[in-house]
Amino acid sequence: LQNEFQTLIVSLTNEQRGVFDDVMAAIEDNKGGVFFVYGYGGTGKTFLWKTLSTAIRSKGQIVLTVASSGIASLLLTGGRTAHSRFGIPLNLTENSICSINRDSDASKLLKQTSLIIWDEAPMVHKHAFEALDRTLRDVLSFGNVRNSHIPFGGKVIVFGGDFRQILPVVPNGSRQEIVNASLSSSYIWTNCKVLKLTKNMRLTVGKDPSEIQQTRLFANWLLDIGEGNAGGSNDGDAVIRIPEDLLITQSSDPIGSLIEFVYPSLLDNLNDPKYFEERSILAPKNEVVQEIN
């Protein structure tokens, strides 16, 4: 692990190294700390998580890596969903706690943990973070009352994500209700040190200039949508025109054409895990997913 860490650490950008140093300093200080790493897709959050995890594990210490969804957790070494790892209730209220007892194995693991990384945090209801906060304050205060007065019981925790992407699902909720359900509307947010990643690393790996330019244009378009600039001024609703080169316009079987575009030569690659790691089809609703499947 030490050799792997040395390879990773020299590959960090200045931005990533700044975040890395801040988090590691908090761990060494042993007084806790809550961070939020704000970066859109492609800024290297996953690489940063890997570097932090390897740095800590190479010292024989424990880091828990979780994500808000199962798919996101697959990108993390030893990753699990936050709900599974911490026993977060599915039906949350403002007074919820996690199903972790003081004398349980999960409690013992948390006491020995040096760092918690929670990826894709913005998509989870704020009550989930507050439930974990209450639970850690309770579990970790046994033998040290001071921890009951420190966010997350004095553990260093790093949240990551992009508030321009998916926010918590509030059934039939208004814009205001959805925003109010977000992490940034929780009492926890006042304790978060926000660190930003702004450099798109995907623009540095392509060798073909035209490919880099195409990626840059697409990334800028996504950012415009996230910032609310793509559809003109609006109060939450907007009509956004999708570029022609992203549309399937002339096909008698659009779904078949989509699958062929995303999974070319599928039958020849059935035994190649990397082939499937590099591509996926996303849809906003289950009914669309079922239609494609």
Where are these regions (language model features)?
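RecA-like helicase/translocase P-loop NTPase motor core
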Residues: 1-293
